[in-house]
């Protein structure tokens, strides 16, 4: 029994890039890398500037949005046109369907979030490549966890994009900035802790790396 179905993977890719979501998936990394180039030209190799760009824009905005766009486009077309019932009626385990869809979403995160994060980090801090590597690895953990969370939303509601945006704005954004304890239940903060440890930064205070990794694995 295959854990991943190539046919379902192809359908997943088509459902993402055959709609407006595919355009946004290309725009977001271009914005990140473009702003990194601009910041480098204006302020040089600034530690503060690189953190604002890679964390404030990359981990907080680009990574979760890429994951949301990728996962919301995987099941929505089948649910909207009713073909999901035919897909579920096929002699394919549901676990294979879910894993195949998640593979597509995670691949999108790697291609449109993690790789651009690495490139942006190298542009901003050529003197310290560990910064780029740290944020890229953090985006892998965070992006994969977001894919798992948003995939669940796409199954339970047809308004996964709206619910996902509310979650990002309220929990990860508003409450995450106001309440210090939210870091223990924040995917973005778990990602930042990985970047902290690899690059020697202090984006998130008093959050053990083992907890961040374990929490991410639990969500996935």
PLM feature spans:
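Alpha-helical transmembrane segments of multi-pass membrane proteins predominantly involved
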Residues: 21, 191-195, 211-212
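Membrane-spanning alpha-helical segments of multipass transporters and channels
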Residues: 163-173, 189-196
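Short hydrophobic, aromatic-rich alpha-helical segments embedded in or entering the lipid bilayer
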Residues: 3-7, 178-203
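Short cytoplasmic-facing helical segments at TM-TM junctions of multi-pass membrane proteins
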Residues: 83-87
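Aromatic- and glycine-rich beta-strand/loop motifs that create alpha-glucan
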Residues: 1-26
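Secretory targeting signals
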Residues: 30-77, 81, 98-162, 166-167, ...
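Alpha-helical membrane-protein architecture signal
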Residues: 2-10, 95, 99-103, 133
